[in-house]
């Protein structure tokens, strides 16, 4: 009997339960793909997420948004890419899914897809079927950002510089712990981004507090204090088996006391027990063409090594 052809549908709110149930059991999904996370910024991104069916069976999801005639996967998330099930799915089905999606997008006036591939550390089981499908559709690599990651199963030791930073923090009476001082931290973060980059955090304080209330176990703030004064902190997203550093900031005194390595050491020792990787995040600007070498060296000094976040462009002909 011939397999049924792939059918593409756009996500709408009536699909919410079906979407979330698929995310729960997929081999490369996380809380980032739950609608309770994706929909918090629906006012910023015109959702154009796709659902691929084989007959009546849902076989893949693509979190995505549309801007003009371009489809992005997804600009409001840490990374993009097709979400795939563990069973009854393979590269042959992925090729059929991509073919069907391209036909669907072309019919709706979309001429380009920007596909932000998911780094392999976020897979709970091998899930690179999409990369081969991109190749088959002539995808062009347009962005390559370097992140720095620790394998928490066998972490490398901090180098002399990082150890010295931790010792400095301890010598100055800095205490590190999980914190609920989100408002104080957001003030530090906002001031830092304004002074260094004339920018603001991607999330407002209200948005982050909302997400924290929805995902209390997956979103945590680890902070350094001295005599009750908040000196710095790191917001960690627990994404499957990965601890991802979402925000890092400190006060001038916090930098002087070198609190950031001390916080990371605490995270590795305490929060990292049930995770496989700690991902420090990317160190690039200008779509990967500029590498902040000093920042990379600091992360490598804490035991991190490189992975890449790649983005591809498909011209839909």
Model feature map: region roles:
Residues 115, 144, 179, 280-281, ...:
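Residue-level detector of family-conserved "landmark" positions at structurally sensitive sites
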Residues 13, 31, 92-95, 202, ...:
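Conserved phosphate-coordination/catalytic loops
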Residues 45-47, 107-110, 219, 273-276:
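Short, high-confidence coil segments that cap the C-terminus of an alpha-helix
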Residues 77-124:
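A gly/proline- and charged-residue-enriched helix-loop-helix capping module
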């Amino acid at each position: 009997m011939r397999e049924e052809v792939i059918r593409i549908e756009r996500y709408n709110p009536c699909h919410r339960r079906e979407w979330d149930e698929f995310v729960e059991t997929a081999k490369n999904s996380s809380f980032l793909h739950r609608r309770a996370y994706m929909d918090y910024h629906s006012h910023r991104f015109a959702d154009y997420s796709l659902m691929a069916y084989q007959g009546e069976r849902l076989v893949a999801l693509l979190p995505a948004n549309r801007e003009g005639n371009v489809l992005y996967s997804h600009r409001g998330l840490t990374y993009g890419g097709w979400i795939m099930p563990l069973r009854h799915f393979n590269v042959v089905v992925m090729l059929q899914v991509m073919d069907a999606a391209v036909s669907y997008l072309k019919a709706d006036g979309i001429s380009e897809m920007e596909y932000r591939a998911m780094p392999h550390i976020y897979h709970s089981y091998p899930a690179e079927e999409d990369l081969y499908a991109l190749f088959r559709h002539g995808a062009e690599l347009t962005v390559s950002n370097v992140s720095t990651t620790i394998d928490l199963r066998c972490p490398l030791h901090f180098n002399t510089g990082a150890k010295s930073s931790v010792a400095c923090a301890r010598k100055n009476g800095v205490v590190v712990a999980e914190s609920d001082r989100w408002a104080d931290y957001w003030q530090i973060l906002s001031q830092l981004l304004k002074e260094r980059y004339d920018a603001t955090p991607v999330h407002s304080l209200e948005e982050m507090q909302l997400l924290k209330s929805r995902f209390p176990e997956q979103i945590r703030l680890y902070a350094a204090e001295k005599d009750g004064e908040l000196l710095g902190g790191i917001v960690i997203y627990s994404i499957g088996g990965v601890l991802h550093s979402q925000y890092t900031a400190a006060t001038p005194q916090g930098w002087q006391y070198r609190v950031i390595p001390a916080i990371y050491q605490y995270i590795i020792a305490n929060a990292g027990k049930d995770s496989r990787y700690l991902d420090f995040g990317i160190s690039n600007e200008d779509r990967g063409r500029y590498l902040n070498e000093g920042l990379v060296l600091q992360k490598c000094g804490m035991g991190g090594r490189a992975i890449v976040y790649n983005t591809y462009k498909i011209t839909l002909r």
